[in-house]
Amino acid sequence: MNKCGEMGKSENKGEPVMIIQFISVLLLGLILGIKHSLEPDHIIAVSTIVSKDKRLSRSTLAGAFWGIGHTATLFVFGILIVLLKGELADKWVMSLEFIVGIMLVYLGSKNLLFYTNRNVKQPTERTSLIKVTLIGIIHGLAGSAAMVLLTMSTVSTVWQCALYILVFGIGTIIGMLIFTTIIGIPFVYSSKSITTNKLLVRFAGSVSFAFGVYYMYSIGITDGLFKLWIK
């Protein structure tokens, strides 16, 4: 079977069969995209932003913009890797994942300190959307491309790869949009009570901070990233 980006001779299959097979691959990509968007490091990071939104529409937009940032990164770097027929060394892949851990700790810290000032400034919609888009970009850089390219071993041309990435990306947008809409409900309603909202915001921050520390330890120590850099 040809890998993505390689030009080989077509197998003796009828065109309708090949079209059906490709559509099946795209549908699988859509499902995998939805599933991928709901990975723990994704939903924890986005929750820290959504927890401070007072309108459900902003929570929904946050999920969409995370997916856009994630998809744009996958598309650009995924196609580049395909065209250059290259791959990142494990050290760099793990380093990008380690950055996600740092980001989670940072986002968690911001939430934990959010109510330390008496005059709390609600983040503007533009600020929130920029932040959540950057989070999506970082997640897109951190190993997702490798997983997508592995799945794309069933397609044979660059344009099919590009289409697959876009469909996969649409799946991540749909998945995160649904999640942020649902998770945004308790945060929006709790915004009427400072005490309740403070607890929820700090809870989201605590989870993000703790998971970020665990994530960095897992990659740096357990998976051996630090040893790779020392060599």
Each predicted region: which residue ranges?
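Transmembrane helix boundary and interhelical junction motifs in multipass membrane proteins
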Residues: 38-44, 141-150
